[in-house]
Amino acid sequence: MARITLAEIADKLGAELRGDGSVEIQSIAGMEKAAEGQITFLSASKYRKHLAECQASAVMLKEADLPFFDGNALVLKDPYLGYALLAQLLDTTPKSASNIAPSAYIADDAIIGEGAAIGHNAVIESGAQIGANVQIGAGCFIGQNAVIGAGSKVWANVSIYHSVTLGSDCLVQSGAVIGSDGFGYANDRGKWVKIPQLGSVHVGNNVEIGACTTIDRGALDDTVIADGVIIDNHCQIAHNVSIGENTAIAGATTMAGSLKIGKHCFIGGATVINGHIEITDGVTITGMGMVMRPISEPGVYSSGIPLQTNREWRKTAARVMKIEEMNKRLKSVEKKLNESN
């Protein structure tokens, strides 16, 4: 296991070192379980009480929390960001592939960049372009004329359909499907007529796509995922959706077709968003939101009924069903009061 001194960590993170810089760190742990040889972090002052019993060799914390800890410390403006950056330095996650496996099928005219690795039973079809240092896990399918940018990592059993473009330094988790048909049909006297989906999917650079997430290809134009977007597991992105830079989408979210989401948005888990609407930059939608109309102002938006006991919820649901009747009765009372005055 790699070791790094506290002084080296301070230098790489731009942190202020307090204590013995020669102490060696080999891993990161949560504050309550951290032991010798490990570093931990305090991201919120409300957890200061754990500092007194912390057994870690060092703690990343804010200057305001320093008086409450007398051990080795790295002082940072944002300890949680420090944790993220240090985790990257100490990352022990294996490669999704380490060489070109003999069982991989690679079309004769596919272009494979220097240092690329392709796992067992992966399929790289005609015209596909795999960039330098790309990792393609076992059992992946890369369709005709698909392009994967340099440094991207694709875990096992991912399907990337024909003509899809995946940018550089992307991460795609197992079971994701990029470029499958959008849900497009015409109706001919009660019978569904399939509309071939002639667009594709364009994914920018530094994008992360979670396990079992599906991103449909466009009907005519492309579905577009901009640079820096992070998408959690089990999300459905329908055809012709456009997602702006650095937007984050939590698990089980469903987006209908031709939705446009701006930059730097946060979409909570299990949110459902209607198609053919636009959400501006800087919008946060809390978990299980149901978005039926455009959002033109930045801010935090919520919908749904918070958790109650089943007994309370049944009463609330019964009252909700009577809102229209209650509204009519209220207007009638208001009218009578106005007439009497």
Swiss-Prot record:
Which residues does the entry assign to the active site, renumbered to this chain? 239 (proton acceptor)
Q: InterPro entries from the entry?
A: Hexapep, Hexapep_transf_CS, LpxD, Trimer_LpxA-like_sf, UDP_GlcNAc_AcTrfase_non-rep
Q: What is an annotated GO biological process for this record, any one?
A: lipid A biosynthetic process
Enzyme class comes to: transferase
* Annotated EC: 2.3.1.191
Q: What keywords is this UniProt entry annotated with?
A: Acyltransferase, Lipid A biosynthesis, Lipid biosynthesis, Lipid metabolism, Repeat, Transferase
GO cellular component assignments: membrane
**Reaction(s) this enzyme catalyzes, per UniProt:** a UDP-3-O-[(3R)-3-hydroxyacyl]-alpha-D-glucosamine + a (3R)-hydroxyacyl-[ACP] = a UDP-2-N,3-O-bis[(3R)-3-hydroxyacyl]-alpha-D-glucosamine + holo-[ACP] + H(+)
**GO terms assigned for molecular function:** N-acyltransferase activity
Pathway the protein acts in: Bacterial outer membrane biogenesis; LPS lipid A biosynthesis
> What does the record give as the function of this protein?
Catalyzes the N-acylation of UDP-3-O-acylglucosamine using 3-hydroxyacyl-ACP as the acyl donor. Is involved in the biosynthesis of lipid A, a phosphorylated glycolipid that anchors the lipopolysaccharide to the outer membrane of the cell.
The annotated subunit structure for this chain is:
Homotrimer.
PANTHER family, A to Z: UDP-3-O-ACYLGLUCOSAMINE N-ACYLTRANSFERASE, UDP-3-O-ACYLGLUCOSAMINE N-ACYLTRANSFERASE 1, MITOCHONDRIAL-RELATED
Homology family: Belongs to the transferase hexapeptide repeat family. LpxD subfamily.
Write the protein's name.
Answer: UDP-3-O-acylglucosamine N-acyltransferase
Q: What is the lineage of its organism?
A: Bacteria, Pseudomonadati, Pseudomonadota, Gammaproteobacteria, Vibrionales
